[in-house]
Design a protein with these regions (language model features):
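Active-site nucleophile-adjacent alpha helix/oxyanion-hole segment immediately C-terminal to the catalytic cysteine
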Residues: 1-56
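Conserved active-site-adjacent core of cysteine acyl-enzyme catalytic domains
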Residues: 50-166
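Low-complexity, Gly/Ser/Thr/Pro-rich intrinsically disordered linker/tail segments
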Residues: 168-179
Length: 179
């Protein structure tokens, strides 16, 4: 028997990072969300997923699509409003793909984050993972991440198809602020 193994952690093998991204984004905006309320929200969203999906296993194994994430997000925002009386405003990134480059996208995201927002973003390419960006510099995004990633460096990102870098797309970014 090996003397030292690295154990798998919750999230290492499942595709529920989208659920965690929603909860982490809301916790960043609403410090009154404690562990008990976060657990209640997680269960509420998981039950909603189970009820809407005929076969929940593909979501658990392969992850949450952008469409499913948006539906869960609407549910989570109603939950936050009902339970905390806090209205959270969610905004999709409205950027045309034509003439889009990484610097423009990064600048837009940085401006959003600089005005008290957080953003759920999908990282494709080198990974397939929903995460939360909470602040930005010209070269890095600071993350609140269920996989314990702390920063995303712009030099490791692209908007083009890739398998070796992190691909970002404005259609898979949602910005939030407390109203």
């Amino acid at each position: 028997m090996p003397s030292q193994i690295e154990p798998y952690c919750q999230g290492d093998l499942d595709g529920l990072c989208g659920l965690y991204a929603i909860i982490n984004a809301l916790c960043a905006l609403c410090p009154e969300i404690d562990e008990e309320l976060a657990t209640t929200l997680f269960r509420h969203l998981a039950r909603h997923m189970e009820g809407r999906l005929k076969e929940p296993m593909p979501v658990i194994a392969y992850g949450i699509s952008a469409t499913s994430l948006r539906l869960l997000l609407k549910r989570a925002l109603r939950f936050t409003s009902k339970n905390l009386g806090v209205e959270i405003e969610a905004t999709e990134f409205a950027m045309a793909r034509r003439n889009l480059d990484l610097r423009k996208l990064w600048r837009h995201l940085s401006n959003e984050l600089g005005s008290g927002h957080v953003a759920i973003i999908m990282l494709r390419g080198a990974s397939h993972h929903w995460t939360v960006a909470c602040s930005a510099t010209e070269t890095t995004l600071r993350l609140i991440d269920s996989h314990d990633r702390k920063v995303l460096v712009r030099s490791r990102c692209t908007i083009s198809d890739t398998h070796s870098r992190f691909q970002l797309s404005p259609s898979e970014m949602i910005s939030f602020c407390a109203g």
